[in-house]
């Protein structure tokens, strides 16, 4: 899309909607996507949910729906959220992890986003005008107050920052 004038042809359309930045970024614009479930016989109709989810949950959720047992080594990080997808409850995933283009990790809970420190530059250099979200210091955002990730609260909420850093470390360590 970059050589075919897609950027120019989009005009004022923002592909990442209300979120900051876009694809390749550590910000929400790089990972937040709508998830649409359409199944007239099985899913609640006309409902929307802001429950946190992850595409990594597809194997466990679809296996449950299909009554297929996954082996312990299969889809290790996948969680069954089929009842949330079908609108039968609103239970969100506890957290989701994303990786930006330079391999820096983010940990997203229902209301907060932690972006791990990174030595990458502030903008993508090879293509679109996209903020990377990379900084040499940890970042923490309250997404319930600003989906655009405007105010870094890492210094104001050190205990929450440490808790999310520890959780990301545990997940990376396989715990």
Positions of the model-derived regions?
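A general alpha-helix detector
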Residues: 61, 149-152
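C-terminal cap/loop subdomain of S1 sulfatases and analogous C-terminal strand-loop tails that border
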Residues: 3-28, 43-47, 51, 56-139, ...
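Intrinsically disordered, low-complexity polar regions and short flexible loop motifs
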Residues: 146
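Bilobed periplasmic-binding protein-like "clamshell/Venus-flytrap" ligand-binding domains
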Residues: 168-175
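Short amphipathic alpha-helical coiled-coil/interface segments
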Residues: 161-168
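Short beta-strand-to-turn element immediately C-terminal to the catalytic PLP-Schiff-base lysine
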Residues: 36-38
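Active-site-proximal N-terminal segment of extracellular/periplasmic enzymes that hydrolyze or transfer
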Residues: 151-159
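Catalytic cores of eukaryotic secretory-pathway lumenal/extracellular enzymes that build
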Residues: 32-33
């Amino acid at each position: 899309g970059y050589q075919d004038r897609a950027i120019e042809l989009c005009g004022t359309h923002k592909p990442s909607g209300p979120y900051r930045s876009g694809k390749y970024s550590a910000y929400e614009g790089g990972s937040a996507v709508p998830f649409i479930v359409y199944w007239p016989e099985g899913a609640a109709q006309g409902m929307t949910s802001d429950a946190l989810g992850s595409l990594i949950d597809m194997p466990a959720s679809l296996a449950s729906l299909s009554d297929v047992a996954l082996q312990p080594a299969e889809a290790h990080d996948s969680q069954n959220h089929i009842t949330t997808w079908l609108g039968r409850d609103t239970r969100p995933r506890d957290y989701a992890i994303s990786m930006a283009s330079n391999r820096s990790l983010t940990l997203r809970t229902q209301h907060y986003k932690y972006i791990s420190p990174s030595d990458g530059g502030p903008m993508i250099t090879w293509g679109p005008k996209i903020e990377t979200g990379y900084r040499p210091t940890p970042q923490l955002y309250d997404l319930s107050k600003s989906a655009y990730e405007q105010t870094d609260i890492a210094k104001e909420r050190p205990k929450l920052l440490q808790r999310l850093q520890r959780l990301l470390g545990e997940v990376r360590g396989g715990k």
